[in-house]
Amino acid sequence: MAKSTVNKLSVSVRTNTGKGASRRARRDGKVPAVLYGHGEEPQHLELPAHAFSAVLRHVGTNAVLTLEVAGKEQLALTKAIDVHPIRHTIMHADLLVVRSGEKIVVEVPVEVEGDAGPDILVTQETTSIEIEAEALSIPEQLTMSIEGAEPGTQFTARQIPLPVGVTLVSDPEMLVVNVVNAPTDAQTKAKYAGEAHEAPEVGTAENKTAATESE
C-alpha cells in the first residue's frame, strides 16, 4: 500500500449539516464526510472529491489518509463510502481515526492467479477476507496461486500467504477457491435437456380453468 503521506488531503470542517448542506457541498466538488473514533467527538468534514476519488482508485477502499484539518494532521482510515447508483460519484464517506502503529481489522480483496490446467473448472467462493494489520501497512490485496491445482483441490483462507505483521481474522477453514473437473459437452447438453424437460407449462392452473370455462 502507498504511504499515507502520499494520500494527503486538505479538508475543511463543515459548519452546516443536513441534506441541503450536503447537496451544496457536492455541487462545489466536495464529499461530505464524518470523522470519528478513539473516543473523540465526531467531526463533520468536506473532502476534495477529485483528490479523494483518485486516492481510492490507486490505493483501494482501505486507503489511510493524512487529513490536514485546521492546520493539524490526522490519520484516518476510509471505513465506508456511499456511491451514487447511476453517476457513480461518491456521495458520503465515513472515516475512522487511527494512530501510527495501531493495528486494525479490515476486509481485503483476494485475487486468484495461476493456471489449474485444461478441462478444469475453478470457482472463487470468497472474494475477500478479514485481516488485522498496522494502519499504515494494510495490503491493497492478497494473492492466492492455484498453479497446477488438480480436481478436488480446495483452497481455504489459511492457505493465503500473508505479509509479515498481518494476521488472519476470518475463519481459517473458510473456502476461498474450489477446483473441479469441468463438465463435458455431453454433461452440459444433458443438464440443459433435463432443465427443458422439467420446465413448467406456460400459464397457471387458474388461467387454464378460466379458459376451459369460457369454452
Curated annotation (Swiss-Prot):
<keyword id="KW-0689">Ribosomal protein</keyword>
<feature type="region of interest" description="Disordered">
    <location>
        <begin position="1"/>
        <end position="29"/>
    </location>
</feature>
<dbReference type="InterPro" id="IPR037121">
    <property type="entry name" value="Ribosomal_bL25_C"/>
</dbReference>
<keyword id="KW-0699">rRNA-binding</keyword>
<dbReference type="GO" id="GO:0022625">
    <property type="term" value="C:cytosolic large ribosomal subunit"/>
</dbReference>
<feature type="compositionally biased region" description="Polar residues">
    <location>
        <begin position="206"/>
        <end position="215"/>
    </location>
</feature>
<dbReference type="InterPro" id="IPR020056">
    <property type="entry name" value="Rbsml_bL25/Gln-tRNA_synth_N"/>
</dbReference>
<dbReference type="GO" id="GO:0008097">
    <property type="term" value="F:5S rRNA binding"/>
</dbReference>
<comment type="subunit">
    <text>Part of the 50S ribosomal subunit; part of the 5S rRNA/L5/L18/L25 subcomplex. Contacts the 5S rRNA. Binds to the 5S rRNA independently of L5 and L18.</text>
</comment>
<dbReference type="InterPro" id="IPR011035">
    <property type="entry name" value="Ribosomal_bL25/Gln-tRNA_synth"/>
</dbReference>
<dbReference type="Pfam" id="PF14693">
    <property type="entry name" value="Ribosomal_TL5_C"/>
</dbReference>
<dbReference type="GO" id="GO:0003735">
    <property type="term" value="F:structural constituent of ribosome"/>
</dbReference>
<dbReference type="InterPro" id="IPR020057">
    <property type="entry name" value="Ribosomal_bL25_b-dom"/>
</dbReference>
<dbReference type="InterPro" id="IPR029751">
    <property type="entry name" value="Ribosomal_L25_dom"/>
</dbReference>
<keyword id="KW-0694">RNA-binding</keyword>
<protein>
    <recommendedName>
        <fullName>Large ribosomal subunit protein bL25</fullName>
    </recommendedName>
</protein>
<keyword id="KW-0687">Ribonucleoprotein</keyword>
<comment type="function">
    <text>This is one of the proteins that binds to the 5S RNA in the ribosome where it forms part of the central protuberance.</text>
</comment>
<comment type="similarity">
    <text>Belongs to the bacterial ribosomal protein bL25 family. CTC subfamily.</text>
</comment>
<feature type="compositionally biased region" description="Polar residues">
    <location>
        <begin position="1"/>
        <end position="19"/>
    </location>
</feature>
<dbReference type="GO" id="GO:0006412">
    <property type="term" value="P:translation"/>
</dbReference>
<dbReference type="InterPro" id="IPR020930">
    <property type="entry name" value="Ribosomal_uL5_bac-type"/>
</dbReference>
<dbReference type="Pfam" id="PF01386">
    <property type="entry name" value="Ribosomal_L25p"/>
</dbReference>
<feature type="region of interest" description="Disordered">
    <location>
        <begin position="190"/>
        <end position="215"/>
    </location>
</feature>
<dbReference type="InterPro" id="IPR001021">
    <property type="entry name" value="Ribosomal_bL25_long"/>
</dbReference>
